[in-house]
UniProtKB/Swiss-Prot annotation:
Pfam families: AMMECR1. InterPro entries: AMMECR1 (IPR023473), AMMECR1_dom_sf (IPR036071), AMMECR1_domain (IPR002733), AMMECR1_N (IPR027485). It comes from the Eukaryota. SUPFAM superfamilies: AMMECR1-like (SSF143447). The lineage of its organism: Eukaryota, Fungi, Dikarya, Ascomycota, Saccharomycotina. Residues 5-220 form the AMMECR1 domain. This is Uncharacterized protein KLLA0D02464g.
Amino acid sequence: MSLETSSPYAFYAFYQLYSQFYRVPKITLETVNDFLYQGKGLKPEFARSPLFVTWKKLKKGEYQLRGCIGTFSEGKIEEGLKRYALISALQDSRFTPIEREELSQLRCGCNLLSQFKTIYSSEGTGNSGDIWNWEIGKHGIEIKFRHPKTNSRMSATFLPEVIPEQGWDQRETFENLIEKAGCWNYLEEVMKHWEKYFDEVIRYEGTKSEIAWDEFETGLSTVAEAE
């Protein structure tokens, strides 16, 4: 995983939420890049990209998760940022919608995903691959598996930065993925016989950038002058 302190992507995502609470002109991602990042912040390889937008709120000196939603579908980056900046801020079912009074305490992260590789699959004549073929701190992980009782298909993912933040090893990562998917009652069963229940394990990499309120607020005046 590579980490940039700020980028046009993160600023643009924050701007989408800000515009929900204040009347501001519509701007393009290119405008942000030109006026705040000297035209050098956009990367051609991410013109279309899967992405996740993460919101964290400063509380007791630490930033704590306030919302995170994204997509593995590859779409136009500007449209994806518009959509998932708001969905993650206002529609993450784990949290209440972010309110205007919280803006000054927020940090917005944007993770652009790439290098997807299926490292294990149960399809075909037999199981193939290695579920351990990934590196903590470099890869995000998505698993797809069958519920032991209902046989329904379940899935969950953790972005590359989540695993080292939590201090998990590889096995603990899979255990927490199973729990996240809603299968906590059968965690031990699934892990003990993962060859039976796992359908697919996919690793991927992320390029993450973040922007906190102070930097975002400073950039607002520059963008306003551009319009």
